């Protein structure tokens, strides 16, 4: 079944999500909670792209099948591990051949799938649209180390809507930086994480954020 972005995300709590793009594309940015099972890895994707430019689509498709063939058992085994007997949510970049072929391959192994219409590109477009909506932001200001993050957590505990920008960025501002933090996400991934937080909010109500100034 082909699903819109909203339909796709609504099923995410019950169904595992698989991103079949290359590992390089996945590292640059991905949908929250997605597992990466590349149908073409970085080098293979380049090879298929080169074949497409030099010889056309038909030869590129043949090259793709030739590259995927020896790894098909491994792809299906990894997919079974991720699926755990559940139906899978699957996407590639544009909802094209990579996700379609992946769904066909694992379908022959008895794994049911749902494909994201428009792929990751549609998800990114949906995020951009969300960022254009009006927000009622209230900003907590103060010097670095003055306890802004603690105030934010207290507000969240009291039921206020909060976006923890430092938490999403894995960063504590200019003075403390990434000290004791996980690696910082790419700009694209930060945008994705911010979009995921916005999806949880009631945009008719106020939203508290923290000012990142050090003065």
Feature map (PLM): residue ranges:
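A conserved segment at the C-terminal end of the G1
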Residues: 103-108, 149-162
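Catalytic cysteine-centered active loop of the rhodanese-like fold, especially the PTP/DSP P-loop
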Residues: 62-116
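Conserved nucleotide-sensing/catalytic segment adjacent to the nucleotide-binding pocket
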Residues: 157-215
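Glycine/alanine-rich phosphate-binding loops at beta-alpha junctions
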Residues: 23, 27-77, 83
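Short hydrophobic beta-strand that contains or immediately precedes a catalytic carboxylate
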Residues: 17-21, 34-37, 163, 208
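Flexible, polar/low-complexity N-terminal or interdomain linker segments that lie immediately upstream
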Residues: 1-32, 60, 128-132, 137-141
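A short glycine-rich beta-strand->turn/loop micro-motif centered on a GG-aromatic cluster
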Residues: 89, 111-124, 164-169
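Glycine-rich phosphate-binding P-loop
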Residues: 97-98, 136-157
């Amino acid at each position: 079944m082909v699903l819109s972005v909203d339909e796709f995300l609504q099923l995410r709590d019950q169904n595992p999500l698989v991103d079949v793009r290359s590992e390089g594309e996945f590292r640059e940015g991905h949908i929250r909670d997605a597992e990466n099972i590349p149908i073409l890895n970085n080098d293979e994707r380049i090879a298929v792209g080169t074949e497409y430019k030099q010889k056309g689509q038909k030869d590129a498709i043949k090259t793709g099948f030739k590259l995927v063939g020896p790894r098909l058992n491994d792809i299906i085994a990894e997919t079974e591990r991720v699926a755990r007997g559940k139906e899978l949510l699957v996407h590639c970049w544009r909802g094209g051949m990579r996700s379609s072929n992946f769904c066909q391959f694992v379908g022959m192994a008895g794994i049911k799938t749902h494909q994201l219409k428009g792929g990751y590109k549609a998800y990114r477009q949906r995020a951009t649209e969300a960022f254009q909506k009006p927000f009622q932001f209230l900003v907590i200001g103060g010097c670095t180390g003055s306890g802004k993050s603690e105030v934010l957590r207290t507000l969240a505990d009291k039921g206020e809507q909060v976006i923890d920008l430092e938490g999403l960025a894995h960063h504590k501002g200019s003075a403390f930086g990434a000290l004791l933090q996980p690696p910082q996400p790419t700009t694209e991934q930060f945008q994705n994480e911010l979009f995921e937080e916005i999806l949880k909010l009631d945009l008719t109500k106020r939203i508290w954020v923290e000012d990142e100034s050090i003065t």
